[in-house]
């Protein structure tokens, strides 16, 4: 790992271990699990302004869909002209077609930190205390293929699947009548990618995915009302 990345990793490690130490008298062996959930919720709370902006961007994009379709049909044979017209339309409307990706992009550094903290035996020059934490008896630093058949794997897999199902329903609800069968199929299946991704990550990262996707579902449900 490049040396300039060691500082944020060490900082995150000391924050997380301090939180674990503070709550361990009350939570016992689940201190690391609760610390991951608390930190994830804190990050998502800080990202609420971006989520609100993304929601407004998605609504604006939905309103622009008829105009976007007309431009696509009109300039189908001239990609350069189409790009210029799309950029002009976005500038006039004050929105961006990529606004919906802001919360996801902003979470990437935190996700990388979580993966790094629970996949290394040594952090900040000392033995990693975090990987000794466990969930239903399964160490947080182990990967899911090793945990197949254990209660931790089964519970987390079921919960991720349930959250993905709700996420797919919300995604389908956001599509309008112009949506193609392919886009509907993608919206229905894409949320289950978190379940597939978690299979190749440490258990702690799977817990992070469960927490953040559950937050996303709750947040979108509230914003769509």
Question: Model-derived features: where do they sit?
Answer:
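Helix-loop-helix
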Residues: 1-225
């Amino acid at each position: 790992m490049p040396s300039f990345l060691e500082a944020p990793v060490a900082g995150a490690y000391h924050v997380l271990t301090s939180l674990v130490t503070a709550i361990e008298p009350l939570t016992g062996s689940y201190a690391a699990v609760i610390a991951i959930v608390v930190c994830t919720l804190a990050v998502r709370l800080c990202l609420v302004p971006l989520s609100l902006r993304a929601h407004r961007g998605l609504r604006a994009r939905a309103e622009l869909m008829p105009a976007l379709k007309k431009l696509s049909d009109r300039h189908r044979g001239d990609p350069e002209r189409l790009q210029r017209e799309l950029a002009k339309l976005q500038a006039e409307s004050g929105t961006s077609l990529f606004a919906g990706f802001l919360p996801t992009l902003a979470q990437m550094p935190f996700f990388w930190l979580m993966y790094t903290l629970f996949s290394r035996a040594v952090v900040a020059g000392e033995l990693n205390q975090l990987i000794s934490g466990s969930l239903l008896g399964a160490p947080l630093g182990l990967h899911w293929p090793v945990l197949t058949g254990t209660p931790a794997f089964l519970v987390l897999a079921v919960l991720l699947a349930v959250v993905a199902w709700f996420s797919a329903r919300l995604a389908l609800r956001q599509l309008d009548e112009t949506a193609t069968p392919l886009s509907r199929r993608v919206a229905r299946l894409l949320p289950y990618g978190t379940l597939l991704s978690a299979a190749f990550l440490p258990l702690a990262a799977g817990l992070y995915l469960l927490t953040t996707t559950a937050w996303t579902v709750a947040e979108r449900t509230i914003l769509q009302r």
